[in-house]
């Protein structure tokens, strides 16, 4: 029974995050929306989604930012459209999640050295791509 309640809570939280990521809701705001303590919310969200609410929000934000950068060359304008107030947050988010700077992303990786390889994992074969800053792509294959 608790499992069904938690599924519903996390489904509601994910929907809320998708619809409101531009406001960059805090852990406290999310927990209040769901109706449980921030500690409990953090624990069950991470258990069900596989990442923390903060990481989930960062990934929603970076995907929206990448989409905005397709339409504009102005990084500040793109950042504002996705709810980020500072250009430094955009830079940090790109490097942390994509392992490239916003400018490198915008130039489609021109001049960056990418290394790649394959590895067997418990989840199947994994294709990994990295830059000097870290892993920038992972894909699993069932072939």
Short names for language-model regions:
Residues 1-11:
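Short, charge-enriched, intrinsically disordered boundary segments that mark the beginning
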Residues 1-2, 24-57, 81-97:
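Basic/polar phosphate-binding segments, predominantly the helix-turn-helix DNA-binding elements
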Residues 14, 18, 32, 50, ...:
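Residues within alpha-helical segments
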């Amino acid at each position: 029974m608790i499992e069904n309640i938690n599924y519903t809570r996390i489904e509601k939280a994910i929907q809320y995050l998708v619809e409101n990521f531009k406001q960059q809701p805090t852990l406290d705001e999310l927990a209040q929306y769901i109706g449980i303590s921030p500690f409990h919310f953090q624990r069950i969200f991470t258990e069900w989604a596989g990442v923390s609410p903060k990481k989930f929000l960062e990934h929603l934000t970076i995907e929206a930012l990448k989409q905005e950068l397709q339409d504009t060359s102005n990084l500040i304008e793109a950042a504002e459209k996705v709810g980020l107030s500072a250009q430094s947050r955009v830079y940090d988010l790109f490097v942390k999640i994509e392992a490239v700077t916003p400018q490198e992303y915008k130039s489609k990786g021109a001049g960056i050295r990418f290394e790649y390889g394959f590895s067997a994992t418990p989840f199947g074969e994994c294709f990994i791509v990295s830059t000097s800053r870290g892993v920038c792509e992972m894909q699993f294959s069932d072939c």
